[in-house]
Amino acid sequence: MSDNTPPNQGQPQQVNLQQVAQQFMAGMQRHFDMLAFNLAARECVQEEAYNARINAPKVMPAGPRHQNFEQMQAYARDLLVRQVIGDCMNLAVTGMNNAHFFLALVKATKASPQVSPEAHAEAQKSQRAFLPVQLDEKFNRLEQDYGIMCELEDSIISLGFILQALMQQGGIVKEPQLDAKGELVLELKTVEILSREVDAGKAHGKLIDQRKVFKEGEALVFSDVELQLILVTIASFADSLFKSVSLYAKSVKDASDS
């Protein structure tokens, strides 16, 4: 009688890094597309349409608190900025957490595709210790435990400070967010166009850094394109991180095979 039990049934398997990375980047694109949709919708909205929608139910929860079109434009913009930066921070942390679990599995298994219960438990223990730590400590542990130097680490840290100022200080930069030079610096990834194919209408470019500097007491203001570039920067950060993780896995496997 043949054994129809699938091999390694119930046995934990190595995480598919490529699949994790693809799913993460697909999520990034959805966030980017949604932001573009919201920005386009905001450009098209008219005061008459807003007032018509306000009056459609013929009743309000608290009429004296009603805000006019200009007030709601400012409020909606502030809400959008906080949402975009908050979502970006969540995405960055999620990417780091996913990367760390893969790294922990690789280390525990010496990059074997088969994961023993003991190795899986060891990786889970490491992950439980990693999840609750502060952002700067996550970067430290990735470097100390796995030799992973994260590109754009400073940008992610700065976004954390920006979110702190938006949520706790009314969007005004204060001393806790400043560096040794008295500045809050955010480096964003943007594209420098190098050449264009006239016939195909295609542009060739490369990613470069674009600095945005805030001083103490300044309000955190971002253009529409800068909000989009924040998402591009998070995507660039994640892409670099996943590539570094892949190189780590290869180095561990090569060492194990030698």
At which residue positions do the language-model features occur?
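Short C-terminal domain-edge/linker segments immediately following a structured domain
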Residues: 120-126, 195-200
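Substrate-binding/catalytic groove segments of enzymes
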Residues: 167, 172-177
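Aromatic/basic-lined ligand-recognition segments
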Residues: 164
